[in-house]
């Protein structure tokens, strides 16, 4: 009986590990599908992902995080952030504020959900994040550089829309330290765009918009920057 009990526990453990590994594998696939669908603005595909991931959202924190990302991705593309349930917003805020360290997962959540924070909370979180990662920027992983760039660009957009006058040197400094490689080109261009917006340099603003449009990036302008920011 003792051996039988140990065997059953062992088999149960194996089954649990297989289930966890299967879920982890699905999570990786879903992440790639989410990134691709969001970049190409495929709302219908995102809706399908929301249903699919929603079946597993209570099985692990990582799965819930991904589910939240899908929910906010859809709302962002539809311009319907205000229609996200308060329960989801509350859980997302709790994830961010309860985090002991700025992991990639937490940063991803924050990057996509920045619009739900009060300005003073957003400023506090931004300050904490960029002071944590401002050193050795070029040595950060490519994935982390992309997430941090997204946070920087979203923050600049939020500050501009809110017409707030605050010190943004921490953001500009981080972007300037990113390696000069194709992956970081968009972040550097858009950071310059907002810098010109804040400085009222309308001619430079128009030049960047025209450059992006003439190089097949009109869809990025539509969803990721505030156009016509003439002061």
Short names for language-model regions:
Residues 1-9:
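DNA major-groove recognition helix of helix-turn-helix/homeodomain DNA-binding modules
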Residues 12-41:
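Short, charged recognition helix plus adjacent turn
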Residues 24-31, 43, 47, 86, ...:
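Amphipathic alpha-helical repeat elements characteristic of tetratricopeptide repeat
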Residues 34-41, 45, 77, 81, ...:
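Hydrophobic/aromatic side-chain positions at a characteristic register within alpha-helices
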Residues 37, 53-57, 178, 212:
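Eukaryotic all-alpha helical interaction scaffolds
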Residues 43-47, 83, 120, 166, ...:
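Residue register within tetratricopeptide repeats
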Residues 48-157:
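Mid-protein regulatory/catalytic core that forms ligand/cofactor-binding pockets
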Residues 114, 121-231:
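C-terminal regulatory/effector modules of DNA-binding transcriptional regulators
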């Amino acid at each position: 009986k003792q051996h039988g009990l140990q065997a059953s526990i062992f088999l149960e453990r194996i089954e649990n590990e297989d289930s966890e590994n299967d879920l982890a594998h699905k999570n990786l696939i879903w992440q790639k599908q989410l990134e691709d669908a969001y970049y190409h603005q495929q709302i219908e595909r995102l809706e399908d992902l929301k249903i699919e991931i929603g079946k597993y959202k209570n099985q692990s924190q990582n799965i819930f995080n991904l589910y939240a990302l899908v929910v906010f991705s859809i709302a962002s593309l539809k311009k319907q952030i205000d229609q996200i349930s308060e329960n989801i917003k509350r859980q997302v805020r709790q994830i961010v504020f309860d985090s002991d360290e700025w992991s990639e997962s937490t940063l991803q959540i924050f990057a996509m959900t920045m619009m739900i924070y009060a300005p003073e909370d957003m400023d506090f979180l931004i300050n904490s994040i960029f002071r944590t990662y401002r050193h050795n920027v070029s040595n950060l992983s490519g994935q982390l550089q992309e997430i941090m760039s997204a946070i920087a660009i979203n923050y600049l957009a939020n500050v501009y829309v809110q017409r707030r006058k605050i010190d943004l040197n921490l953001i500009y400094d981080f972007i300037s330290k990113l390696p000069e490689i194709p992956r970081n080109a968009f972040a550097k261009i858009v950071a310059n765009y907002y810098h010109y917006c804040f400085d009222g340099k309308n001619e430079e603003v128009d030049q960047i918009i025209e450059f992006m449009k003439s190089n097949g990036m009109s869809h990025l302008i539509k969803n990721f920057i505030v156009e016509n920011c003439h002061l």
